[in-house]
Amino acid sequence: MEKWYLMTVVVLIGLTVRWTVSLNSYSGAGKPPMFGDYEAQRHWQEITFNLPVKQWYFNSSDNNLQYWGLDYPPLTAYHSLLCAYVAKFINPDWIALHTSRGYESQAHKLFMRTTVLIADLLIYIPAVVLYCCCLKEISTKKKIANALCILLYPGLILIDYGHFQYNSVSLGFALWGVLGISCDCDLLGSLAFCLAINYKQMELYHALPFFCFLLGKCFKKGLKGKGFVLLVKLACIVVASFVLCWLPFFTEREQTLQVLRRLFPVDRGLFEDKVANIWCSFNVFLKIKDILPRHIQLIMSFCSTFLSLLPACIKLILQPSSKGFKFTLVSCALSFFLFSFQVHEKSILLVSLPVCLVLSEIPFMSTWFLLVSTFSMLPLLLKDELLMPSVVTTMAFFIACVTSFSIFEKTSEEELQLKSFSISVRKYLPCFTFLSRIIQYLFLISVITMVLLTLMTVTLDPPQKLPDLFSVLVCFVSCLNFLFFLVYFNIIIMWDSKSGRNQKKIS
């Protein structure tokens, strides 16, 4: 009883922080003519309510795709339609065709913020609570502390409740998928993940680990027996879920192709705005977007992404395990973020979710990563006038992690899960005994750099010739951190050893 009482308190704390952040500004507030993501979500409600399904993704006089045209999968459109019905009941002006463009009011802001909170309460928060309750080999207090830290992760809160999006829906479905598959409810887990992909196509960042883990399970059961039966069942679940979600768009071939064109807009280029990945960072020194043809950029990003995630995926197929699955989710999502085509700064949330799932296993490194992921979105958060909420939520999260996990005491090679790797290296370099000390120093350098860059960005004006100087520096520093983490997580995956300390797993 006490466990559920404390878990309820944790959820209430998470909800309080979320609602407090929601009282602040949002993307594009009072900034015509395009406004921002808040207006995009409102506009999708307008379009889905007033136009027939076959016109949702097509350009027309009633649906100007240049003005926040719908570019997410059908499940997002259905969610927008559901919200639109509620909006119509409260105030029809909020979704009136054409005349509602750029609509802003306190009442409408309250409505929009409430829709995010309800989605969070229905999908993401229950998944977090159940995940933490199912963790093995840790005390009840640690499970509750784990839930608190995950629910206080500032990146997701600031984007969903500040900037304004519904990332908790797709991430929540993905987490339900992780829960299902880790608990051997493979069909339910696959269904949940299919819903995640059909809500936001960026969930494809997680698709390969799901595929490889399930394929590994099938191989382990034997493809001539139970494994083959499981494979057929999984294929049926995936096909059926996609067919049901896409059914209204399968009536005509052009309908399906148009939706796909909207979901994967190759013509937008290698990257947009300032994002902390390889291509944006490297573009500072060599203008890749201007020098290389579009098709070469596509091939280059595909090959880089594929090669960077291949080792972890092969290992997961050959040795499927719950622990390996979670770490491969991190590695693959980070590879996609760093190397893939058309990445947005908010896509780092797709990496942050699986990092949250290993928070209790490697608290020091997970906390560090989650701090960097929030920092990497600083230019966007400043643009939305969310500096104060960013600072407060980041400090609250950091304090929660420090007090819950004593992260500064968890920096030994064993606690960092680098013991097997260090032993392997010491066979050739016996003096290699300082790895944990190096990581501690790197953490200090990283945190100091982030603090200094934040202060510089807020207090100093950039040179006139370099107006984006601080934004570029934030992205570059974040990218360096992410490259380090990519190496680190792949080391854990490739050097995973049974001789290491017992890992907390979901049964």
Swiss-Prot record:
Disulfide partners: none
GO aspect biological process, one term: protein N-linked glycosylation
GO molecular function: dolichyl pyrophosphate Man9GlcNAc2 alpha-1,3-glucosyltransferase activity; dolichyl-phosphate-glucose-glycolipid alpha-glucosyltransferase activity; glucosyltransferase activity
Record keywords, A-Z: Congenital disorder of glycosylation, Disease variant, Endoplasmic reticulum, Glycoprotein, Glycosyltransferase, Membrane, Transferase, Transmembrane, Transmembrane helix
Family according to the record: Belongs to the ALG6/ALG8 glucosyltransferase family.
Name the record gives this protein: Dolichyl pyrophosphate Man9GlcNAc2 alpha-1,3-glucosyltransferase
Organism lineage string: Eukaryota, Metazoa, Chordata, Craniata, Vertebrata
A GO cellular-component term linked to this record: endoplasmic reticulum membrane
